[in-house]
A protein has these predicted regions:
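N-terminal, positively charged/glycine-rich alpha-helical extensions of SAM-dependent methyltransferases
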Residues: 2-57
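Conserved alpha-helix/loop element of class I SAM-dependent methyltransferases that forms part
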Residues: 67-83
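Conserved glycine-rich SAM-binding loop
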Residues: 93
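Class I SAM-dependent methyltransferase SAM/SAH-binding core
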Residues: 96, 100-132
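Conserved SAM-binding strand-loop segment of SAM-dependent methyltransferases
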Residues: 130-141
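A conserved beta-strand element that flanks and buttresses the S-adenosyl-L-methionine
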Residues: 153
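A short glycine-rich, Lys/Arg-flanked "PGG" loop and its adjoining helix->strand segment in the class I
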Residues: 167-179
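C-terminal alpha-helical "lid/dimerization" subdomain adjacent to the S-adenosyl-L-methionine
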Residues: 186-230, 241-242
Length: 258
């Protein structure tokens, strides 16, 4: 801020006017600074997220380091979702994405839902679980009631249920959206052929070998065509983009029409 010279009336003529004007100036500049530095590229937030899992066992810590790096520390979600939005993350796992979104914008209201009670307990009782205000719910996505939200997220979670239940879950999610809300689905695209093989292999490794993720049925991945049909049937706009260039990971953004 430039030095204010004696007699300068830029910020008012009285001490009261100057005090109020300068307060507004610092608030405005602080918000600008937060917009620049409260992003996933800031090493502070990356380190804070990973350190949240260092006393939860070597496998979980290693998994988080790899997973968060592969997911770009959730920069796509941070830039997509407004900083005052209400968010429900269905299939939150250990809530790493929710913690990042909450750290970057504390004014967000976030609900983290997962079927695995163990993961919910680990997340709830972690440092960030107590610090960020993320609200945890343990339950099956097919039966649990979703909170009213601006954004409902399904990140690599829909493929744990069959096609019929996928449709039912998404329909219930639509009913839980606030006006102008969005459903964001990130999952492997079954129609991508060879590129989809990597996703299937990693899920096999995760569910059958390491038993890191719980599943009671065979995996069922949606396709781009399936998602487009669903959007048309429910009068929603849809945006589709490739999430990770090395596999079939695809981002589907379903928007309610006003």
């Amino acid at each position: 801020m430039p030095r204010i010279k004696h007699g300068d009336t830029t910020y008012g003529t009285t001490y009261q006017e100057q005090t109020k004007a300068l307060r507004r100036y610092f608030i405005r500049e602080y918000r600008t600074m937060c917009e620049e530095f409260s992003r996933t590229h800031n090493p502070y937030f990356r380190s804070l997220l990973i350190r949240n899992y260092i006393y939860k066992g070597p496998i979980l810590e290693w998994y988080m380091r790899v997973k968060c790096r592969m997911d770009g520390y959730y920069d796509v979600y941070d830039r997509l979702i407004p900083r005052d939005a209400t968010i429900t993350d269905v299939g939150a796992g250990n809530a790493q994405m929710d913690f990042m979104l909450a750290n970057l914008a504390p004014e967000r209201t976030i609900y983290a839902i997962d079927y695995d009670e163990g993961k919910i307990e680990v997340a709830r009782n972690s440092f960030l679980g107590r610090r960020t205000g993320v609200q945890f719910m343990c339950g099956d996505m097919c039966t649990i009631e979703f909170p009213k939200s601006d954004y409902i997220l399904f990140s690599d979670s829909l493929h744990y249920i069959d096609s019929e239940r996928q449709k039912s879950v998404l329909e219930r999610a639509i009913e839980s959206l606030n006006e102008g809300g969005c459903i964001v689905v990130r999952d492997g695209n079954a129609s991508h052929g060879h590129a989809h093989n990597l996703i299937e292999l990693t899920e096999l490794w995760s569910t059958k070998l390491l038993k890191f993720n719980k599943t009671t049925t065979d995996l069922c991945f949606v396709s781009e065509e399936w998602m487009r049909r669903f959007a048309v049937e429910h009068n929603m706009d849809i945006e589709i983009s490739q999430y990770w260039r090395y596999s079939s990971e695809t981002l589907y953004i379903l928007k309610t029409r006003r």
